[in-house]
């Protein structure tokens, strides 16, 4: 019994240490978006698209074991960061994307270089007409988009 309790304690401690509260900010040479926070705005049922603005963004949870970024949603639901075609969004659907960090830079499926700040993206509520939206293009990003990287700031593990 002592072994099982000790083993369970180690496993639970490791799981807690793997979860980290973070915020995301923009790294860019462009002064319009440089240092701005990444937040998310409602665009559909259980779906929030990522936008850039302000200096204080929401707190997300990064789970290094699951390689996922999440945030609490309504009731007992959780939203996960996902790339939906080119739109970056928080969704109640589980993401198949793999999120890691190279230093403090967010990597999607191993790349830190394919994030963009774009306007007029065709998002459902047309928020991108006046705000930069975070988009992901593995290739052929529109020339009007700004190349960005997403950097984390955070605390130590959750408890």
Residue ranges and their predicted role:
Residues 20-46, 91-159:
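Extracellular glycan/ECM-engagement signal in secreted proteins
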Residues 1-21:
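Fungal secretory targeting signals
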